[in-house]
Design a protein with these regions (language model features):
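Surface beta-strand/loop "capping" patches
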Residues: 125-162
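Substrate-gating cap/lid alpha-helix
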Residues: 63-101
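Alpha-helical scaffolding within the catalytic cores
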Residues: 6-12, 41-46, 74-84
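Glycoside hydrolase catalytic-domain groove-lining segments
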Residues: 32-60
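Oxyanion-hole/transition-state-stabilizing segment in secreted/luminal serine hydrolases
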Residues: 10-31
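Loop/turn elements at helix/coil->beta-strand transitions in domains of secreted/extracellular proteins
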Residues: 16-20, 53-59, 89-95
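The substrate-binding groove and active-site-proximal loops of carbohydrate-active enzymes
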Residues: 24-37, 69-72
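Single conserved hydrophobic/aromatic residue that forms the stacking wall/gate
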Residues: 1-5, 9, 163-164
């Protein structure tokens, strides 16, 4: 990311006050998923430098399921994986999922209020330390394979219900 770009941003935002960043982008990156995490990390570092806040919270939305034109079936999944990787390498960051509200034919989930509520809840718990709010959804932590079955372990899954098929 260009240092000059940071100087331009700094001049434009220096009189504003911010407590954190909310970010929803990535659909156009499904074809370059392999560099998404380092690019987003560099962007967050630049923004934090511009705001002179090296630990300012950065919360973002994982892309929703969608049938992307001209893409392999795995491209969007690989981008979602890259977004999880970014979560692991960007300090003081958080991610909300839209896996349950995606639309095959609409690139952005139609339920914007749900996305906003999830981001707000994440910020309230992580930035403002309000306890008792469900700020993250189920996160897969482990998979074991045994006798032709996959046993999947999740964190944050107390409200998760499963259907045996």
């Amino acid at each position: 990311v260009s240092r000059g770009l940071g100087d331009v941003y700094k001049r434009q935002v220096r009189n504003f006050t911010a407590r954190g960043f909310l970010w929803y982008q990535g659909e156009s990156n499904i074809f370059n998923y392999y560099c998404y995490a380092p690019m987003m990390t560099a962007m967050v570092q630049l923004w934090r430098e511009v705001w002179e806040a090296p630990n300012m919270p950065f919360y973002y939305v994982q892309i929703a399921p969608h049938k992307y034109k001209d893409s392999q079936d795995t491209d969007a999944a690989l981008l979602r994986e890259a977004q999880i990787k970014a979560l692991e390498i960007i300090p003081n960051s958080g991610m909300v999922s839209t896996a349950d509200i995606g639309d095959e034919f609409c690139i952005h989930p139609p339920q914007k209020d749900v996305v906003g509520l999830r981001l707000a809840t994440l910020a309230l718990t992580k930035t403002y330390n309000i306890c008792g709010l469900p700020s993250t959804g189920p996160t897969m932590t482990k998979v074991n394979y045994s006798e032709g079955k996959a046993i999947v372990t999740f964190d944050n899954a107390s409200a998760l219900s499963l259907i045996h098929i």
